Amino acid sequence: MNLKLAPSDFEVYIPLAEWIEGNIKEWLFAQRPLFKKISAPIDTVLNSLETVLNFIPFPLILIIFVFLAYRTNGIKFAIFSLISLIFIDLVDLWSESMTTLAMIFTAVLFCMLIGIPLGILASRSNTFEIILRPILDIMQTIPSFVYLIPVVMLFGVGLTPGVVATIIFALPPIIRLTNLGIRQVGKGFKEAGFSLGLTLSLIHI
């Protein structure tokens, strides 16, 4: 009896990779219409913002950004922003920069539309918060670029996968902060609001 024999010594072939690949392809083909519907509003907002940002003249955007930089961080940051924006235009990357900015605005918009309602639900239901907490932990632990692999597989190549990956990574802080902010409102403030005739939704706002 040869005790050195191992399963790999026998000519047995298990097409596991082919089974997995075939099932994934079939599932993706069947679910393609669903993911197109999901990506449709993202594409609409993204394309609209990209068109608007590329339509606005360079001097106007320059003035707006430099003014915002001055108002938020002072003259030094405003000068730095001015030099940076001029440099971007000189190296002929202005259109790409506006596309990136449109992606950021789109991701922020959808994060707010999804995150704030979920945060309100989490603040009103301890059970929902307990269920949601480990999911948010996983979403924040995994690096953002890791999301691109399944997202590209589901939504295809383009700008939309980048926006979806950004939404997934940026969503947990909005949900957590909304939940925490509502939970930290004192009972006295809530009672005062109810006494003035406010509904719970208005108090949350």
For each of these PLM feature ranges, what is it?
Residues H204-I205:
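Conserved small/polar residues in nucleotide/adenosyl-binding loops
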Residues L196-G197:
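Glycine/proline-centered hinge or cleavage motifs at structural transition points of membrane proteins
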Residues F58-I64, I75-F87:
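Hydrophobic mid-bilayer segments of alpha-helices in multi-pass membrane transport proteins
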Residues M103-T106, C111-I114, S123, D137-P173:
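Generic hydrophobic transmembrane alpha-helix motif, especially the helices
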Residues N2-P57:
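Interfacial loop/helix-cap signal at membrane boundaries in integral membrane proteins
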Residues D43-N54, W94-T106, E129-L132, L136-Q140, ...:
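Alpha-helical membrane-interface segments at transmembrane helix boundaries
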Residues P33-N47, L60-R71, S123-L132:
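Short juxtamembrane and helix-loop transition motifs at transmembrane-helix boundaries
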Residues F65-Y70, L85-S95, A107-L136:
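Transmembrane-helix boundary motif in ABC transporter permease subunits
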